[in-house]
Regions:
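Extracellular glycosylation-rich, acidic/polar low-complexity regions of adhesion-
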Residues: 1-178
């Protein structure tokens, strides 16, 4: 797994578009409501493998997500947009983001606990996006775990084999003041 520094602004995911459809840092909900999660800060996480038969997938866990923050990610199996918010006490809520309407998430590919999100069948094309806590700037030090899951079929039954490839790999998210 390869990770790199990510950089963005404190209002990432919370700003709106102007009348011409352009990002405008001056248009935002003062209460910190997430209005444009797709404008979050992309996390620079890439997983690779030498396995070329298509039987291998990756499970990525992002840790140390701050209270009041959020992660926006595309669900790998359905393509639905998922918004995971973390309350001030760290309690996560997973919802489907349907053009601003929050719906219940009933899938199992994305799970969350206090300060963490786990994404099964991780997709490099759609990296998760970090939304910092409202009005927060500075550096956020997240950690990434990754494992490969290789599935073979034996006597008609799928048999998964897991191999941890990274534990607590640091990823710094620099959040600039606006």
């Amino acid at each position: 797994v390869k990770v790199g520094q990510s950089i963005g602004y404190e209002d990432a995911g919370r700003t709106s578009l102007d009348k011409d459809g352009k990002y405008d840092k001056n248009i935002q909900d003062k209460d910190g409501t997430i209005t444009n999660p797709e404008k979050g800060i992309p996390l620079n996480i890439k997983v690779t493998s030498t396995d070329k038969d298509g039987s291998e997938t990756f499970t990525v866990t992002i840790k140390d997500i701050p209270n009041g923050g959020a992660i926006f990610v595309k669900e790998p199996l359905t393509g639905k947009d998922i918004l995971v918010t973390y309350a001030e006490d760290g309690t996560p809520t997973i919802k489907v983001w349907n053009n601003g309407i929050l719906e219940d998430y009933t899938g199992t590919t994305i799970t969350a606990n206090k300060g963490t999100i786990t994404i099964e069948k991780y997709d490099n094309v759609n990296p998760p996006k970090f939304i910092p806590p409202h009005n927060s700037h500075g550096d956020f030090d997240l950690k990434v775990d990754a494992k490969t899951v290789d599935t073979v079929v034996i006597d008609g039954d799928p048999v998964p084999s897991e191999n941890t490839t990274a534990i607590d790999k640091p990823i710094k998210v620099v959040v600039k003041d606006v």
